[in-house]
Design a protein with these regions (language model features):
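Sec-dependent N-terminal signal peptides
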Residues: 4-13
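Boundary at the C-terminal end of the N-terminal hydrophobic targeting segment
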Residues: 16-19
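Extracellular polysaccharide-degrading/modifying enzymes targeting complex plant/algal/animal polysaccharides
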Residues: 22-348, 353, 399-410
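The right-handed parallel beta-helix/beta-solenoid scaffold, focusing on the short coil/turn
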Residues: 46-48, 55, 61, 70-72, ...
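Extracellular beta-strand solenoid repeats
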Residues: 51, 58, 64, 73-75, ...
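Short glycine/acidic-rich loop motifs that flank beta-strands on beta-rich extracellular proteins
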Residues: 61-62, 268, 295-301, 341, ...
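Extracellular beta-rich repeat passengers
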Residues: 127-128, 140, 297, 522-582
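Right-handed parallel beta-helix
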Residues: 282-293, 330, 350-361, 373-388, ...
Length: 582
């Protein structure tokens, strides 16, 4: 049994109002939270702070905070809350190191990430880990030849897949305009210089029936690039790894004389803050804590075919004839969505705040205000080495609602309102799902996104709104102010530094600086990028005083009453100097 140490310092001897609980990494976070509950329940304290001393707190299940924990503060002193497990017992096998993967909580595990000495290693893949000149190794991706929608077959050059023709668990990562799909390969059949690839279900049906985004072929534009991963046959460079789930072995090709501290993720979520509509979780603050080492296993189990911003399709198909929508253009497709897990997830909360935290080494998203969250600040936090979205807020259509339909819940408490994300630093997020976003806000009201610095990301910097629809919905009074965004769109286009969807009365996007877009050669349309982009249904939005190197903007199928005022290179230096993290 783990040793549990609690040192409780009480504010006064008789009627105590505050208490402090001090724990160490060999203590239980869950037990500390329970102790805080009991102090409050027994009337011994009204405010409790749990102090996490330095070190790594390995979890075997998510830490759950409920309405009974309202008023709690967690303070970290170089503390890491980890969903990982250390791998030890490495043995040399030629150029590789191999270790047994132990069970976790009594069962075998699988994972999609590995961190070695604090750095994400590369899951064995068909493109180089890096190139001597520092250029983008993904420039060496192969391109598809064509695809057969009816029979669910994708054709590729034989040279591209020759190594993995018989690999049992290989995956294709397919670049599709503004998304990437993860497709588990079922079969490879050679015919001359080409190979016909089929995929496992359920993603095979989704991949060939969803119309947007679709892969490009030589007949439709720049053919879609792809790379292969998760096959031992691809493990050929230092820094790469492969997990043999049949044999429960982990293979890693090390740097010369590299001494390993290796961690694999075993949890998908670290902290769940969950209340109810009548009894939300209130007034919780988490300070100075690092959240690390999660995975997200759905792509390994069911594939991953997203519509946009990493929101994955559960069903999708093309409409014939198209649907007439009053005040909107005709609709040619249907889609229902799910969302990836995040390291920290919130539902039915009020004033749950994060100050000076780090979200890093994560295989899903970072921080997600999912449903019915009121207020809540995220300040002076760092988001880095995240596979998917960094900060996420609001609904992206409930699972049962077709995603192009307007979302206007009868109970407005469902809507995330009044969040404030400021003075945060986002970089090297979206590093696995390239179609994800640093700050991704869907159906939100009164969100304030200001003075953040965002750079080195795969796609769009800030995405605000959802729905592809100009009908009046629950979005309003949002603010995007004085953010600095650069080196974005490193892998995907049809993007912008700041991007909007839908009708958002009272929304103002002002005094932001957007510059320095990346120029990958493999995007579907090399001209389809923008600094500012109001997409379908965007209405009642004010864009003013934003500095960009040129007026490369797009207004696509917008609704009424958008205002564009004083945006471009003429905006004053004082605005440029004030943008970003302070």
């Amino acid at each position: 049994m783990k040793r549990i140490l609690f040192f409780i310092c009480l504010a006064c001897c008789l009627q105590m109002e505050a208490a402090d609980i001090f724990i160490t990494p060999d203590s239980s976070l869950t037990d500390a939270v329970r102790k805080a509950r009991e102090l409050r329940r027994l009337g011994k304290a009204t405010e409790v702070t749990i102090h996490l001393s330095g070190g790594t707190y390995f979890l075997y299940e998510p830490l759950r905070l409920r309405p009974v924990d309202s008023g709690l503060t967690l303070v970290g002193e170089n503390a890491v809350i980890s969903g990982g497990m250390q791998i030890t017992g490495w043995k040399r096998q030629g150029k590789l190191l191999v270790a047994d993967v132990p069970d976790f909580n009594g069962r075998p595990i699988d994972f999609r990430q590995l961190w070695v000495n604090g750095k994400k290693a590369v899951r064995a893949r068909s493109v180089p880990v890096g190139l001597p000149d520092g250029s983008d190794p993904f420039e060496q991706m192969h391109r598809i030849l064509t695809y057969d929608k009816k029979n669910h077959v994708l054709w590729v050059p034989k040279a591209a897949v020759s190594k993995i023709m018989k690999a049992p668990y290989a995956e294709m990562v397919l670049h599709e305009m503004w998304c990437t799909s993860n497709l588990r390969i079922k079969s490879c059949t050679a015919q001359g210089d080409s190979v016909a690839i089929t995929f496992h279900s359920p993603e095979a049906k989704l991949q060939f029936e969803h119309p947007w985004p679709s892969p490009m072929t030589p007949n439709t534009g720049h053919p879609s690039p792809f790379y292969l991963t998760n096959a031992k046959e691809l493990l050929d460079e230092p820094g790469e790894w492969f997990h043999d789930i049949r044999e429960h072995k982990l293979y890693y090709m090390p740097e010369t004389s590299e001494k390993l501290t290796a961690i694999v993720p075993v949890l998908e979520t670290l902290v769940e803050v969950v209340g109810t509509a009548e009894h939300p979780v209130r007034n919780i603050t988490i300070k100075g804590v690092t959240f690390s080492h999660t995975t997200w296993m759905r792509p390994s189990e069911k594939g991953h075919v997203p519509l946009q911003a990493g929101m994955y399709l559960t069903e999708a198909y093309k409409l014939r004839p198209q649907i007439d929508r009053p005040n909107n253009h005709k609709l040619d497709n249907q889609g229902w969505l799910g969302r990836a897990d995040a390291a920290v997830e919130l539902r039915y909360t009020e004033d749950v705040n994060f100050e000076g935290c780090r979200f890093e080494h994560l295989g899903g998203s970072g921080l997600d205000y999912i449903l019915a969250c009121r207020r809540g600040t995220t300040t002076n936090c760092t988001f880095t080495d995240i596979a998917m979205n960094g900060y996420v807020c609001g609904s992206f259509s409930p699972e049962g609602l077709e995603t192009h339909l307007p979302y206007q819940p009868s109970d407005f408490r469902e809507v995330c309102t009044g969040q404030h994300v400021s003075n945060c630093h986002f970089y090297n997020v979206t590093n696995e799902d390239w179609g994800c976003v640093a700050i991704c806000a869907g159906y939100v009201s009164g969100i304030n996104i200001e003075h953040n610095t965002i750079h080195d990301i795969s796609y769009t910097g800030i995405s605000l709104g959802w729905g592809w629809n100009r009908d009046l919905v629950c979005m309003k009074d949002n603010k995007v102010h004085a953010n600095l965004i650069y080196n974005y769109a490193q892998h995907m286009y049809d993007c912008a530094g700041i991007y909007t969807l839908g009708n958002q009365p009272g929304t103002v996007i002002s005094e932001n600086v957007v510059r320095d877009i990346a120029k990958p050669s493999y995007v579907h349309d090399p001209n389809h990028w923008f600094y500012l982009y109001t997409d379908e249904g965007s209405s009642n939005i004010t864009m003013k005083d934003n500095w960009t190197p040129s007026e490369k903007y797009l207004q696509n199928a917008n609704g009424p009453d958008n205002t564009w005022e004083n945006n471009g290179p003429q905006v004053g230096d004082s605005i440029k100097q004030k943008a970003g993290k302070r």
